[in-house]
Amino acid sequence: MIRQVITSYFLTVCLLALVQGETVQDCENKLPTSLKSRLCEIRRYEIIEGPEMDKHIHCVMRALDFVYEDGRGDYHKLYDPLNIIELDKRHDVNLEKCIGECVQVPTSERAHVFYKCLLKSTTGRTFKKVFDLMELKQAGKVPQHQRYTAEFVQIMKDYDKALNC
């Protein structure tokens, strides 16, 4: 019985590792030439338009598990992290609004529309913190259980500096 439980657990962990897929770094490594020179702008959350940017943001938002495969924003993946960093009832409204906006555009543009909508909303500052924290966790720069603190600003600056940004 114990052997079956252990085997089942091991197989589940292996399956999750396979499903997890790409990281933000993987997405940045696949940037097309036209965007490679703009990586630092992208990392500063500057809005860049175009189909190549749509594809990149889709990749990054999927890597962080903030959107579904079809690019729709995942309310449940962002609501708690946003409110842990900053408790604000507007996060709920902004997530709903941005999900509503992204479902009205073609699938290829959804993740980018969701991303831009969140950045432009009153949730934007907190969304950037959640985004940075999740990226740092994914890159192994901070423990998975770690909450956002002021020191993450410097950790992220150091991480960006290592990328020549």
UniProtKB/Swiss-Prot annotation:
| Main location as per UniProt | secreted
| Consequence of substituting residue 160 to L | Reduces serotonin binding and eliminates tryptamine binding
Q: Where in the cell is it found?
A: Secreted
Q: Which GO terms describe its molecular function?
A: odorant binding
For binding tryptamine, which residues are annotated in this chain's numbering? 115, 132, 135
Q: Name one GO biological process term.
A: sensory perception of smell
GO cellular component annotations of the record: extracellular space
> For noradrenaline, which residues are the binding ones?
28, 43, 132, 135
- Source species, domain of life: Eukaryota
Q: List keywords of the entry alphabetically.
A: Disulfide bond, Secreted, Signal, Vasoactive, Vasodilator
- Entry keyword Transferase: no
Read off the Gene3D superfamilies from this record.
Answer: Pheromone/general odorant binding protein domain (1.10.238.20)
Q: Which residues are recorded as binding serotonin?
A: 28, 56, 115, 132, 135
Entry comment describing in which tissues the protein is expressed? Female saliva (at protein level). Female salivary gland. Not detected in female carcass without salivary glands. Not detected in male tissues.
Q: Does the keyword Signal apply?
A: yes
| S-S bridge residues | 27-59, 40-165, 98-117
Q: Name the residues that bind histamine.
A: 115, 132, 135
Query: What does the annotation give as the result of altering residue 132 to L?
Result: Reduces serotonin binding and eliminates tryptamine binding
Secretion signal, residue range per the UniProt entry: 1-21
Q: Which residues form a coiled coil?
A: none
Its job: Modulates blood feeding of female mosquitoes on vertebrate species by binding and sequestering different mediators involved in the host response. Binds serotonin, noradrenaline, histamine and tryptamine. Inhibits histamine-, serotonin- and partially noradrenaline-induced smooth muscle contraction. Exhibits vasodilating activity.
Which family does the record assign?
A: Belongs to the PBP/GOBP family.
| Protein name per Swiss-Prot or TrEMBL | Short form salivary protein D7R4
Organism (species): Anopheles gambiae
Q: Which gene encodes it?
A: D7r4
